[in-house]
Amino acid sequence: MTLWRIRATVDDRPGFLSVLTASLALRKVNILSVQVHTTETGAVDDFLVEAPEHLTRADLVDAVQRGRGRDPWVSPADVRGLVDEPTRVLALAAKVLDGTATLEEAIAALLGDCDISWRAGATTKSSAVAAAGFTATGMQLPDPAGGTLYVRRPAPAFTPAEYARAQALVEVAKVGARHTAS
């Protein structure tokens, strides 16, 4: 068996997720975990699955599309994906606070395969608010140390939940910086 991460948008209506999961089950794909990210265009379902060795990325994309999933993204995964998401995020926050990880390292671990760059800028509250925001492929986050962090990822598209998690890590880093300065 092979581990895969699958992300797809499904209409947020009764029964639509079950159609997708049935399509995967027909191919002997076992769903190990699922996260649901609510968006304006539907529910973005993020699965960690175990699939028979012979199934390819294309086979899984086909299964998702036949199950009424849209915008499928499929990538190989490993056992680290089995860690409970809230536990993983709390561990990242602890690393930021105790200094064993930088904010950039924690955000990269949180969001997966992404590029993070930093640009100098003012650090007033209004500039920090102006620096915040996200699109499908990018995020802007105020760096508590000053400037702005730019996060880019071509796929899968960022969700509001991922943006909120990244913002929460920024807030944790702010608290850590205040305590360090004290």
Language-model region placement:
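A conserved regulatory-domain signal marking ACT and ACT-like small-molecule sensing domains
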Residues: 1-95
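Short amphipathic alpha-helical segments
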Residues: 12, 16, 56, 99-103, ...
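Conserved beta-strand segments of the P-loop GTPase G domain that flank and frequently precede/overlap
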Residues: 119, 151-152
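Signal-transmission/dimerization alpha-helices at domain junctions
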Residues: 165, 169-182
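Positively charged, low-complexity terminal tracts
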Residues: 1, 120-134
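Helix-loop-beta substructure at the N-terminus of cytosolic sensory domains
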Residues: 27-30, 96-124
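Short hydrophobic beta-strand micro-motif common in sensory/regulatory domains
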Residues: 133-147
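Regulatory loop-to-helix N-cap segments in sensory/regulatory domains
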Residues: 152-164
